[in-house]
């Protein structure tokens, strides 16, 4: 139990100790036996006044709740400890649980199961990170695309090649546990207190490796290059999963297959697993010089060694549709993220230092199921494929279509680059970046860029770059589950994470993975 002193606003260049001193001053708790620590810090660059905003935890040897009530200060509150209750069932599990997919959701599901003695079997269609790095690098240098091992598939999932953002809006108490587990396996210790924590692809990969080793150390098994090909269901209940040409008997399987496992979606649907279409988004990647974003958001303080590379979050709604920035990568690169042949797909990635020349983010436009309804659950998948194939046809290769913002706004193709150089690793073809998108998405992007330029000075500058398409922001389907977390149509299957339509980002996927593990643990003994 603790006292929380929130909203402590100080000049950005003061050390953390100044926030602790201010918390002590505000509460009058200056005695040496009062322990204090910063538990949250963020940067506020609004209105041209750059501040760090702190929350400080104070642990006192008396009734902290009564003290907070007596103070009657809105910025001082009592925070009881949140105890996570680990469930333990009594039924006997005949076969070890199976976890399909080793992205954030599957990784955390398997980790929790292994740490509590359930010896999970993990099936991952891609390779381990060592192999994956080699395969991805070879593709980016002009080699063949491996449709089972790429940016989307393999150990760590799509999140392993991202900015490693750990922000979420779900407010689940398990979020703290996720951060603690990541920090215990090599993530920077400060992720537990930053309001916008990130790890970076370089560090995150090592964290994933360490967690996988811990799974194996605790009795789990991980099989790479082993895609799920189907499930066996008897009387509405799971009895086996199919992989590697064999039936693997199991009563419980966590399906954390990722948002790009389109062939697996189709196979599971054919086995009777229920799917429904859901909203998602499509768009392009936008790149600016990071120094220009810093100047726009930090003003004269841009470049100060105590300020991180600036990041942003933009959104606009009009005519029942949204356009928003997504997965912003300060000092990052645009990456080739396709998982099917003869397609072009972009995504964003950055390293922990975020010290690249460009800033990039997706500019995504919302897509509603009514935009693509074809009478099946997979109309959104079909739309994604049409966009990705159209981009490939446009360039004639895995190179991505690219266009300056000024040319896009003026409705003309780009012939020559300006100050911003594209970072897409395979190379780009200058022309029209958004021509592969539906008309409504092109219109929304064209109308939103000037609006965003009024929010961040220079955002719609003529030399900024658009590279497309961005189609994998989230899953276009949901593997619908009931209150018991089982998938409709098959008791024993637990759809999980982004691919199931129940998460968006590393943190929420990891939390969903833990919840899936708890669902098994509350029913069965280890």
Model region roles, listed by residue range:
Residues 1-52, 56-185, 189-526:
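Residues forming the flavin
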């Amino acid at each position: 139990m603790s006292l929380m002193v929130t909203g402590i606003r100080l000049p950005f260049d003061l050390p953390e100790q100044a926030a602790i001193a201010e918390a002590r001053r505000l509460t009058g708790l200056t005695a040496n036996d009062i322990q204090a620590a910063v538990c949250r810090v963020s940067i506020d660059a609004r209105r041209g006044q750059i501040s760090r905003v702190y929350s400080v935890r104070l642990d006192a040897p008396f009734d902290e709740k009564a003290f907070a009530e007596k103070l009657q200060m809105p910025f001082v509150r009592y925070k009881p400890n949140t105890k996570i209750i680990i469930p333990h069932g009594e039924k006997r599990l005949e076969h070890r649980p199976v976890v399909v997919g080793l992205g954030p959701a599957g990784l955390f599901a398997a980790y929790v199961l292994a740490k509590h003695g359930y010896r999970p079997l993990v099936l991952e269609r891609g390779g381990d990170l060592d192999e994956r790095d080699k395969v991805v690098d070879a593709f980016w240098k002009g080699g063949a695309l491996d449709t089972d091992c790429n940016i989307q598939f393999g150990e760590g999932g799509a999140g392993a090649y991202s900015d490693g953002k750990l922000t979420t809006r779900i407010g689940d108490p398990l979020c703290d546990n996720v951060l603690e587990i990541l920090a215990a396996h090599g993530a920077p210790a400060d992720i537990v207190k930053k309001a916008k924590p990130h790890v970076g692809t370089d560090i995150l990969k090592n964290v994933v490796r360490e967690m996988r080793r811990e799974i194996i150390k605790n009795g789990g098994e991980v099989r790479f290059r082993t895609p799920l090909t189907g499930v066996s269901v008897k009387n509405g209940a799971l009895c086996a999963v199919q992989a590697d040409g064999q039936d693997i008997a199991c009563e419980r399987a966590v399906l954390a297959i990722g948002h790009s496992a389109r062939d697996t979606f189709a196979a599971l649907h054919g086995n009777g697993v229920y799917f429904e279409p859901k909203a998602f988004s499509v768009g392009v990647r936008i790149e600016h010089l990071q120094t220009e974003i810093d100047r726009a958001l930090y003003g004269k303080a841009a470049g100060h060694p105590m300020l991180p590379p600036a990041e942003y979050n933009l959104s606009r709604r009009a005519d029942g549709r949204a356009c928003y920035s997504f997965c912003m990568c300060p000092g990052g690169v645009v990456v080739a993220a396709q998982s099917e042949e003869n397609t072009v797909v972009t995504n964003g990635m950055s390293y922990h230092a975020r010290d690249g020349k460009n800033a990039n983010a997706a500019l995504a436009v919302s897509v509603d199921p009514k935009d693509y309804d074809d009478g099946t659950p997979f109309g959104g998948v079909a739309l994604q494929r049409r966009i990705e194939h159209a981009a490939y046809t446009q360039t004639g290769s895995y190179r991505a279509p690219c266009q300056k913002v000024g040319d896009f706004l003026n409705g003309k193709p780009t012939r020559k680059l300006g100050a911003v150089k594209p970072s897409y690793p395979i190379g780009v073809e200058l022309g029209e970046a958004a021509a592969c998108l539906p008309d409504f998405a092109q219109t929304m992007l064209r109308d939103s860029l000037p609006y965003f330029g009024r929010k961040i000075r220079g955002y719609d500058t003529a030399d900024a770059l658009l590279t497309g398409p961005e189609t994998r922001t989230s899953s276009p389907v949901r593997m619908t589950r009931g209150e018991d977390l089982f998938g409709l149509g098959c008791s024993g299957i637990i759809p999980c994470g982004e691919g199931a339509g129940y998460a968006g980002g590393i943190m929420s996927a990891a939390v969903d993975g833990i919840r899936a593990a708890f669902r098994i643990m509350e029913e069965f003994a280890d």
